Amino acid sequence: MAWHQALGFGAENYRFHDHEKLAHYANAATDIEFHMPFGFKEVEGIHSRTNFDLSQHEKYSGKQIKYFDPQTNESYTPYVIETSIGVDRMFLSIMCHAFCEEQLENGETRTVLRLPAALAPVKLAVLPLVKKDGLPEKAREIVDQLKFHFTCQYDEKDSIGKRYRRQDAIGTPYCVTVDHDTLQDGCVTLRFRDTMEQERVSIADLNAIIEEKVSITSLLKKL
């Protein structure tokens, strides 16, 4: 359950569902279910297969498969706990939760794919404010610096607002805007997908800031 909840979809969207009917070798079984738009559906199955599997190996191989407990001075055949997470079910649960259409204060509808940053295919988009005055060149320079660390996109077509919307729709968690001040102070505007909040950061700090937010390590630390 810890892995599922680390994705940030809310503990209230998960539940355990215990099996009433069990396989002949099992003494317990439960499913982890996620609240899809069409109801709670299984994303992971967990089964206690008791010592059936290893006992069968012992029986037909003629070899003992036992664990000796030094504290109790007893030997026993270990139980096997089987867990199964379907990639397709996991993908569906992520997409169901991530897709959002929200109304903005100006009346427009914003389509957002709120993918966990660690799982987003594109981590960062670098956008020159305009297609002149050396801004595209500076933006591409930043892409060249960061592309070895994570997947980046460069986009200079249409207004900055439309470019933000495109990145929101494909789930890019962060956008960097290069403006005229960038050429003077070496700083860029970092925009956050989910909140649309922006902050000014140094180009020199970009790699460390983004890496901390989008690395799989940051997700695993939540477990």
Describe the role of every protein-language-model region.
Residues 1-223:
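NTP/phosphate- and nucleic-acid-binding module
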